[in-house]
């Protein structure tokens, strides 16, 4: 998949189509909350495997049962279709 920067209209659609994500400072981000650290870490492990598949890696934070994921495409300096795809895949993992 060749990444391209999403335009304003596409970004507005993104936050509607992919629930929970918001646009902040040229990136999209979402906070995920779990019952405990083990659930949070299991989620991060599953996300890591998808990230490897797309060769696209998030900035993320984990504090106990909370995971914050931030996505953008550093090489292009903004939010791309690849970030959109990865956010959608991450939501699927969370919804399992």
Swiss-Prot record:
Gene3D superfamilies found in the cross-reference section: Transcriptional coactivator/pterin dehydratase (3.30.1360.20)
Alphabetized UniProt keyword annotations: Lyase
E.C. number(s) listed in UniProt: 4.2.1.96
Catalytic function, reaction form: (4aS,6R)-4a-hydroxy-L-erythro-5,6,7,8-tetrahydrobiopterin = (6R)-L-erythro-6,7-dihydrobiopterin + H2O
One Pfam short name: Pterin_4a
GO biological process, one term: tetrahydrobiopterin biosynthetic process
A Gene Ontology molecular function term of the record: 4-alpha-hydroxytetrahydrobiopterin dehydratase activity
Similarity section: Belongs to the pterin-4-alpha-carbinolamine dehydratase family.
Name under which the protein is recorded: Putative pterin-4-alpha-carbinolamine dehydratase
Organism: Prochlorococcus marinus (strain MIT 9215)
Lineage: Bacteria, Bacillati, Cyanobacteriota, Cyanophyceae, Synechococcales
